[in-house]
């Protein structure tokens, strides 16, 4: 079962939490869910170059709080914060609520499954050899602290007549282990021969405490430790 199911969905409530964090009455639930889908589609389309990892939506009383996890926050913020203010106004119009917009920098995009998948998809669109793209991504992830990674590419790879699936794995990726902190991401490459799908699983170690926010907290702590060690090296 662990081989088939989305590994993030399998671990919700154990060491992962939802990207939409709000409660609603039965009558409002459908409307708010559609709003979330529209917000994510709008931001993904508007910020194609910003390397967005995920979008978290929270709804405190009559408000909306959107948090964008991005590897290139400067593109979203713009000169003197002009672009982020435009985005905030558009989101307020879409939700008819007072909307706040937060940006969280992803300091290690090389071990973020969604960003790895996007990078490989971009390389496939530029006609880079798929094996080379996969191998590069695997080496970068393992070098920066991932305990295991698996990448699947499927479709008419290299312009082949018959579609197929190729995969590459290094280290451990224990999909059945619920305490395993596994990040999962997908992307599509629109090539001249058709669409190629990319799936990425990244194993970041085990989380022993039963806490749905553990994975997110761990990522932030890891980023802070990485930035402080970089500062120490610079001072030395």
From Swiss-Prot:
The keyword Flavoprotein does not apply. GO terms for biological process: translation. The keyword Cytoplasm does not apply. Residues 214-236 are annotated as: Disordered. One of its GO terms (molecular function) is structural constituent of ribosome. Part of the 30S ribosomal subunit. Forms a tight complex with proteins S10 and S14. Transmembrane segments: none annotated. Binds the lower part of the 30S subunit head. Binds mRNA in the 70S ribosome, positioning it for translation. Belongs to the universal ribosomal protein uS3 family. The lineage of its organism: Bacteria, Pseudomonadati, Pseudomonadota, Alphaproteobacteria, Hyphomicrobiales. Residues 39-107 form the KH type-2 domain. This is Small ribosomal subunit protein uS3. Gene3D superfamilies: 3.30.300.20, Ribosomal protein S3, C-terminal domain. Keywords: Ribonucleoprotein, Ribosomal protein, RNA-binding, rRNA-binding. InterPro entries: KH_dom, KH_dom-like_a/b, KH_dom_type_2, KH_sf_prok-type, Ribosomal_S3_C_sf, Ribosomal_uS3_bac-typ, Ribosomal_uS3_C, Ribosomal_uS3_CS. It comes from the Bacteria. GO terms for cellular component: cytosolic small ribosomal subunit. HAMAP family: Ribosomal_uS3_B.
